[in-house]
Amino acid sequence: MSFGKVLQMYNQMEKLPFGKTLFSYMFAFHSPYLLTIRPIVNEMKPGYSSVTMKQRWAVQNHIKTVNAIAVCCLVEMSMGLVAEASIPAHLRWLPMGMDVTYKKKAMGTLTASSTIPDTFFNLDKYPGMVKVPVSVINADGVEVTYANVRVWVSEKPKK
């Protein structure tokens, strides 16, 4: 199975000094609002992604926890990473919405991760909808947010 250029770029850049940081900002740059959370990609491979953000003043709300929208940005980035790393090269994806459950106050360093099976994008027909699960944990390993991101999958147009 052939995967996209984003995964190849990650695999090359992670070996370089500051490569993960540079890759993180390059990936987020394509959806500039993601830059507001200053994400760092921990890992990206077919079936799995992990991305971290630190709590700071710019992403806090009035009760000094990480703002819900910042957490959703983290969720969206983790989903995008695992989708890019896992989807076959002849398909494309588009997020259509997310169902989010806030379980605890989101404070400190947060890590979003997503795991999907190898057969995840093997739909009976295209286009079709899949749900990508994303879990957000704090530095103590406690899940603070859980989300299912609805993703529309279709074949790339022929060139």
Which functions belong to the PLM regions below?
Residues 36-44, 48-54, 60, 66, ...:
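Soluble, non-transmembrane catalytic domains of enzymes that act on hydrophobic metabolites at membranes
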Residues 69, 73, 77, 97-102, ...:
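Hydrophobic alpha-helical segments of small multi-pass membrane proteins
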Residues 9, 54-79:
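Hot-dog-fold acyl-thioester-processing enzymes
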Residues 1-52:
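Non-catalytic linker/capping segments at the edges of enzyme domains
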Residues 37, 47-49, 94-98, 108-110, ...:
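A generic structural signal for short beta-strands and their flanking turns/coil linkers
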Residues 81-117:
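Hydrophobic beta-strand-centered segment that forms part of the acyl-chain substrate-binding groove
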Residues 50, 97, 146-150:
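Well-ordered beta-strand positions in beta-sheet-rich domains
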Residues 1-18, 106-107, 117-159:
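HotDog/MaoC-like acyl-thioester-processing domains
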